[in-house]
Structures are given as C-alpha cells and as structure tokens.
C-alpha cells in the first residue's frame, strides 16, 4: 500500500528543487498534494509532473499561487486546499532560501536581514499558524519544517540565513511539545548542500565545489535525498518521531 494513501499535503516552495522532488514523491506514495508556489510557471509544471507520477497510487496535485509572507495569500491557498481535497494532514514548510547579498552582521543591510527572516522564519510561522487548525480538524498529522545544516554548524558570511534557519530549528522543538496533545508531530529537516538546478548554476564556475565535497563525506546531496526523508516524516512510519532536527547532510556536521 502507498505510504501516504489518503493523505493531503500542502508544500510551500514546491515549484523546484527539494519542494518539487518532495511533491513528486508524495504523489507517488498516494498523497493529494497542493503545491503552494509564488512562481506560476514552475508551480504549474511541478503540479503536472506530480500528477503524472501519482496516478497509479491514487496521488494527485494542485498548484496554488502563494506568497508565504502574506496572510491573505496563505489563507486563500489553504481554503483552496480544503475546497479541493476536503482536509489537510501534512504541512511541509519548504519555502525559503539564501541570498548572494547576505553577509556578516556588521556588513549586511537591515533590509536583507528582514528579507531573510520574513521569507524563511515568518513564512514558516504563518503557514503553521494558519495550517494547524485544519490539521487538528483532520485528527492530527505531520508538520515538516525546513531548517539547514547551518542551524547546527557555523557558516561565516551568511548571518541572516543562519539566524532564520536556527530559529526554525528552535521553533520546531517548541511546536512539537505544544501540539503533541493534538496528535500533530513537528520535525525539521536540516540538509547539507543539495545540488538543485539553482545550486548547480551557482557552483558551476566556483572553486567552492571541491571544499564542499571534502566536508560532505558521502557526496553532495540531491533533492531526491531530502524528499525521501520528508516522505518518512510525513508517513506513519515516524509515528513516534517529533521535535527532531533530522540532518541529511552527508556527514557535514561531524567534520
């Protein structure tokens, strides 16, 4: 039987990279997937791909244009989810990302700091705040936040990004305690370097690739590696797992 059969999942930032790979795997495992994405073209393409992969298992996918920084946008996306699929079981707060203009606190702008906080941390907060009541109505479920290896290990020159991802890890633990009585499990994934198409382009002409490879003992990750962990955390296989920051980093945190 498909591991997510009968489940409805809401994935933010599902148009590319880890989000798209996760949407495809969720659909393959029988879930009805809502891809909440700000970019219409990538969101539609991801939904079409997920639908194609999920047919044999009963999976389906829907794209909903969503800006996780705006309450009205998230409310509308969740309303469309309930209208289309009737409930919400799984919330994957995946939207976020680093910026090339990040830097040390004495050099980075205040605007960049708030940009990182609003997209990564506030977006996770807002989608959880508005999504949890729907999960409660469904009888419980799973929330999967997206932290990073930088929440566990220093990354000089990325003080805005590390602040946001570290806060997400802390919030994940407190949410896990808060909502356990409601039968909601809350965990976060902390990836190392993941070779999405965007990251491949950034590293194409960079000498950093050799340095990164040396600290990732089993090789650099792919979006599919993170997606497999998300499937596990979304499924009943992890029924006793909550409050955990799950590193999928090829050993980067132990080097």
Task: Say what each PLM segment does.
Residues 148:
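Residue(s) in the substrate-gating loop at a strand-loop-helix junction
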Residues 98, 102, 153, 218, ...:
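Short C-terminal tail/terminal secondary-structure segment
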Residues 215-226:
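A conserved structural motif in NAD(P)-dependent oxidoreductases
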Residues 154-162, 174:
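Active-site loop-to-helix junction immediately N-terminal to the catalytic Tyr of the SDR YXXXK motif
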Residues 102-105, 109-117, 199, 211-212:
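Substrate-binding pocket helix/loop in short-chain dehydrogenase/reductase
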Residues 128, 164, 172:
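Active-site helix of classical SDR
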Residues 133, 177-181, 239:
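Alpha-helical segment proximal to the catalytic Tyr-Lys
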């Amino acid at each position: 039987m498909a591991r997510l059969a009968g489940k409805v999942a809401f994935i933010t930032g599902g148009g590319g990279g880890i989000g798209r790979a996760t949407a495809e795997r969720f659909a393959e495992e029988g879930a009805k997937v809502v891809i909440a994405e700000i970019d219409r073209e990538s969101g539609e393409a991801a939904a079409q791909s997920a639908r194609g992969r999920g047919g044999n298992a009963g999976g389906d996918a829907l794209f909903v244009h969503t800006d996780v920084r705006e309450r009205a946008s998230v409310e509308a996306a969740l309303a469309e989810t309930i209208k289309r699929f009737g409930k919400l079981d799984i919330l994957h707060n995946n939207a976020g990302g680093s910026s090339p203009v990040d830097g040390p606190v004495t050099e980075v702008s205040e605007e960049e700091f708030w940009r990182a906080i609003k997209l990564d941390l506030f977006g996770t907060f807002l989608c959880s705040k508005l999504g949890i009541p729907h999960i409660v109505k469904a009888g419980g479920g799973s929330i999967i936040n997206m932290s990073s290896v930088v929440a566990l290990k220093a990354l000089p020159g990325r003080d805005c990004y590390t602040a946001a991802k570290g806060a997400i890890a802390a919030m994940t633990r407190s949410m896990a305690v808060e909502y356990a009585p409601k039968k909601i499990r809350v965990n976060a994934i902390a990836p190392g370097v993941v070779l999405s198409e965007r990251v491949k382009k950034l590293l194409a002409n960079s000498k950093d690739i050799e340095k990164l490879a040396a600290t990732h003992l089993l090789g650099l990750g792919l979006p599919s590696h993170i997606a497999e962990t998300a499937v596990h955390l979304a499924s009943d296989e992890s029924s006793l797992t909550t409050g955990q920051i799950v590193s999928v980093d090829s050993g980067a945190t132990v080097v």
